[in-house]
Regions:
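Hydrophobic structural segments
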Residues: 1-171
Length: 171
C-alpha cells in the first residue's frame, strides 16, 4: 500500500479549510509502506525510536518543525537534526491535525475522553470548533489533574483557577 492511500483513507469524508496544515512534511507519498508509526509529537527522541523500529511512514498530530504550517526555521539546530534523521531513515511524515479535529466527533477529543475514562455530553463550541465535555458527575480541577497524571503518565500540569471547585464542563 502506498503512503498516499493511507492518508486518503484517514481523511475520507472530512472537510477542512482550504489552508490546512495537514500535509506531507518530508518524504514521498508514492512510497510503499512497511511500518506506520503514530505520534503526537515528532521529537528528536521519537524520531530516533521510530527509525530504530523501522517505521517508514509517520503520522504526527502537532507541528514537526515548530510552526503551525511548518514554515521552516532552516537555521535552527534542532530542525536541522530532525531533517537529517528523517532523511537518513527514509521516513515520510504526514501531519494529521485539521482532519482529526474537523471530523464529527473530534477524533483527538474522543481519544482523550476514552483514555481518561470520562463520561458526559460532548458539544462543539463556536470558539474555533473546540469541543466541550459536560461531565455526568462534577469533578474538581485537582481530581482531573490526578486522573491525567495517573492515566496518561503526565507530570507537571499547570492549572489556572480554583483547584477544589467542582465543575462539569471541561475542554
Amino acid at each position: 500500500m502506498k503512503i498516499k492511500e493511507i492518508t486518503e483513507f484517514i481523511n475520507n469524508g472530512v472537510t477542512v479549510e482550504e489552508q490546512t496544515c495537514d500535509t506531507y512534511k518530508i518524504g514521498n507519498e508514492e512510497n510503499e509502506v512497511k511500518k506506520v508509526a503514530v505520534t503526537m509529537f515528532a521529537t528528536v527522541d521519537n524520531i530516533k525510536k521510530m527509525k530504530e523500529w523501522g517505521a517508514d511512514f509517520v503520522i504526527v498530530h502537532e507541528p514537526t518543525f515548530y510552526d503551525h504550517f511548518d514554515n521552516k526555521f532552516s537555521e535552527d539546530v534542532v530542525v536541522k537534526e530532525k531533517y537529517k534523521l528523517l532523511e537518513e531513515a527514509g521516513i515520510t511524515i504526514y501531519r494529521w491535525h485539521d482532519h482529526s479535529h474537523c471530523d464529527k466527533p473530534d477524533r483527538i477529543f474522543e481519544g482523550k475522553i476514552y483514555y481518561l475514562g470520562l463520561k458526559g455530553d460532548e458539544k462543539r463550541t463556536n470558539w474555533g470548533g473546540s469541543t466541550v465535555l459536560t461531565l455526568d458527575e462534577a469533578m474538581t480541577a485537582s481530581e482531573i489533574v490526578k486522573l491525567i497524571e495517573d492515566k496518561l503518565n503526565v507530570r507537571n500540569l499547570r492549572v489556572a483557577g480554583e483547584l477544589n471547585k467542582k465543575t462539569t464542563p471541561i475542554l
